[in-house]
């Protein structure tokens, strides 16, 4: 719900549809084409088929949320493939991209002179949030935080039925990564 509302705020303030605002102020600034990062599937033959584990509790309850006969194919070696579909919910998960496009996004965020965000706002973006009593929430602005071998990182995951993507940034180290799966979640 939060990202849907944020998308509406962006539309109200900018006067542009959410997809147009993101395309103009983020995607085009990175020099990416709509086939690299955007809100449409340009060539479904180049997209990976998404899968969900066939014999799993989550697959059992998945039928409560969608018509599996309409959106999923027959099981393949323990996995159920999703048929081509697009989630109509751009602010909360409608961006489709390649690994190279997300790497370009991460690289720009790590630059001192990012084309996407002013340095003072970037510092706020990766700053830990705290509750009113000072307890860390484990989140920044739209990023979750964690530690790996003593190094702090910020990450954001996305996906949907049959897909999972996570970008991770280590702000203090100046490095980042992207990982993509054509299966639901990491488990």
Where do the model's predicted regions map?
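Short, surface-exposed loop or secondary-structure junction motifs
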Residues: 1-161
